[in-house]
């Protein structure tokens, strides 16, 4: 299945907003990748990067602690999925849309080089009090994807047959993973 939108978030601080957006966007006909509802067993990392590659829009849910691990030099960057997802989306030229949650007024200016470009991206400010206005603005002004009239689901067998190709370092995902995990 090809996705229009990938949602990236921290489980603590961003899950509720991410899940709410996922439900609304799906109901409106967008094909949305949301890890908990749409990923199955297998190579989790490869499947995530493949989905980012397929999508046009990358929504980044930013709570007040979203970038704490990213700027912590003691934290293993290979275990920081938000950073890995964001770095890959930026490297692939995706339409990155940061959604700033309550308590976040701007993105930090001390981000690592692989994700620093996110500070140049614009997105709607999320407010619970004016959620409908936020959602309308997100869909009408920031998303490049258009809703699909028909949502199709592929079976796991079809998806699995192509997974071996994503392990090869000659593909974009393979090269990115190889670069990401090589020792420094």
Regions from the PLM with identified roles:
Residues 47-50, 75-77, 112-114:
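Short low-complexity, flexible loop/linker segments enriched in glycine and/or proline
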Residues 11, 102-105:
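Short glycine-enriched loops at secondary-structure junctions
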Residues 40-43, 64-94, 104-108:
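Conserved TIR/SEFIR loop-to-helix hotspot centered on a Trp-containing motif
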Residues 1-64, 90-92, 133-141, 146, ...:
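Conserved N-terminal substructure of TIR/SEFIR domains
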Residues 109-124:
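Von Willebrand factor A/integrin I-like adhesion domains
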Residues 96-100:
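Conserved beta-strand/loop subsegment of P-loop NTPase cores
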Residues 45, 79-83, 128-135:
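Amphipathic alpha-helical transducer elements in NTP-driven molecular machines
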């Amino acid at each position: 299945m090809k996705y229009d939108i990938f949602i990236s978030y921290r489980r603590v601080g961003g899950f509720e907003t991410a899940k709410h957006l996922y439900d609304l966007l799906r109901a409106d006909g967008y094909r949305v990748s949301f890890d908990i509802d749409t990923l199955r067993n297998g190579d989790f990392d490869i499947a995530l990067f493949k989905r980012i590659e397929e999508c046009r829009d990358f929504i980044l849910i930013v709570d007040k602690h979203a970038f704490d691990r990213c700027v912590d030099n003691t934290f293993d960057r290979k275990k920081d999925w938000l950073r890995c997802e964001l770095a890959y989306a930026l490297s692939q030229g995706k339409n990155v849309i940061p959604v700033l949650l309550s308590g976040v007024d701007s993105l930090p200016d001390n981000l690592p080089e692989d994700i620093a470009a996110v500070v140049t991206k614009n997105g709607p400010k999320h407010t619970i009090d004016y959620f409908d206005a936020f959602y309308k603005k997100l869909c009408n002004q920031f998303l490049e994807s258009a809703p699909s009239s028909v949502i199709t689901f592929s079976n796991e067998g079809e998806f699995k047959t192509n997974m071996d190709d994503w392990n090869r370092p000659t593909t974009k995902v393979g090269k990115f993973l190889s670069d990401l995990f090589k020792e420094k």
